[in-house]
Structures are given as C-alpha cells and as structure tokens.
Amino acid sequence: MTFKRRNGGRNKHNRGHVKPIRCSNCGKCCPKDKAIKRFIVRNIVEQAAIRDVQEASVYEGYTLPKLYAKTQYCVSCAIHSHVVRVRSRTNRRVRTPPPRFARRKEDTPKPAQPGQAPRPAGGAPAAPRA
C-alpha cells in the first residue's frame, strides 16, 4: 500500500509505545511523538502597556519577566488554528522549516509605485477630468 508520509505522521522510530499527552486546546489524548509542540515565549505585559509599567517601576533598568509556555496540540487542533498547514503531495516531502517573514516597519512611508501619480494630501479624491 502507498504511504502518505515517510515517518507515518509520528516521531517514533524503533519504539513500540509512546505515552499519550493531552491536547492544550481540546484535551484529546494524542501520542507525545505525534503531537505538534510549540514553545511560546511572550511578555507578561502586553506591548501597549510596557512603557507605562517601566516608567512606574521603582527599579532602574528593571527587565520585565517573560511568560514561557509549552503548548501541545493534536493534529486536528493544530490544523484548525493554523499552527501547521495542509501541504500538497509534493511539498509534504520538504523537511526545511517554512520561511519566517520579517515584520514590516509601519512608520516608514511606502515608496511610490512606478507609473502611478502621487495621491493628493488629505485623502480627498482628485478633481474629475473635464
């Protein structure tokens, strides 16, 4: 019979049994080697309030602690929440991690597209042609 994945969807090579874990989202039992695991490092304070907390801090140069969480998902929850994506039959064989896209700078103005006139200031529509 043909096979879909080289590893059978698991990381269990030469092991007979692997203990199950519970999915962080739905609580379903899933083998530990089959679960999709992500280690999340976040700031405890949200981005909008970091400056306020640092200014209100008594200690100079106090670094805010981070929140470390390991999440383990079953396959269906990982696909549903877009942690992993369904890939085509040929792309399933690709083992390199997907490219991480860099965040855009929001404060830099976009360069003008070639062949387009600049937009008028104030966001008002241009005068109609006569």
Swiss-Prot record:
Entry keywords, A to Z: Ribonucleoprotein, Ribosomal protein
This protein's GO CC annotations: cytosol; cytosolic ribosome; cytosolic small ribosomal subunit
Residue span of region Disordered: 86-130
Ranges of biased composition (kind: Basic residues): 86-95
GO molecular function annotation: mRNA binding; structural constituent of ribosome
InterPro entries linked: Ribosomal_eS26, Ribosomal_eS26_CS, Ribosomal_eS26_sf
GO biological process, one term: translation
Compositional bias of kind Low complexity: 113-130
Domain of life (superkingdom): Eukaryota
Protein family: Belongs to the eukaryotic ribosomal protein eS26 family.
Protein name according to UniProt: Small ribosomal subunit protein eS26x
Organism in which the protein naturally occurs: Arabidopsis thaliana (Mouse-ear cress)
Highest classification ranks of the organism: Eukaryota, Viridiplantae, Streptophyta, Embryophyta, Tracheophyta
